[in-house]
Amino acid sequence: RTFVLQGGEDPGFSDELVCQTVRAIWNRFPDCAVTLSLGEKSPEIYRLYHEAGAERYLLRHETADPVHYRKLHPREMSWAHRMDCLHALRKTGFQVGCGFMVGSPFQTAECLAADLKFLEEFQPEMCGIGPFIPHHGTPFREYPAGTPELTVYLLSLIRLILPGVLLPATTALGTIAPDGREQGILAGGNVIMPNLSRASVRKKYELYDNK
């Protein structure tokens, strides 16, 4: 079992509070792992998180194609820095997770091939992929969603490439198809992540419509 603490890159949510939360979970549930997914941080902050007791960190690489990455992100973000963060996490001692959205804007078959090659070379302990689902408040609101069929197919390929990887059947897959999570498990997924957040606060972390 593992507790996954996931959030945006919010400067109002201090690193000390993250560490306090990790320690509190460890004290109450010493038999469980703690996974963080809080975006790009400095190597020093990653080390603080690890020393507090976090064992795993999920940071999706988003795409293995630098040109595609530039099309998806603001100018101040770079593919090279994302790679630096992933390698810093591994150097710190984390079990590292990466991944990508299926059907994201401007994605091509060549992008997906590069993603699979990157996973084979990086050998992550976790891999999170799910269909792109547009959000009405973003620049990509008019783009079509990714398909469950392609997502499930890629899950099966990743299972063959990385036989021992932790591979979630994601919430997004369950959102886009009524039996999406079941399809994901049958295709090779081996992790289910129920949302333990109170219903009253879930709208504060609305990554896509109908999350």
What are these regions (language model features)?
Residues 120-211:
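Auxiliary Fe-S-binding modules of radical SAM enzymes
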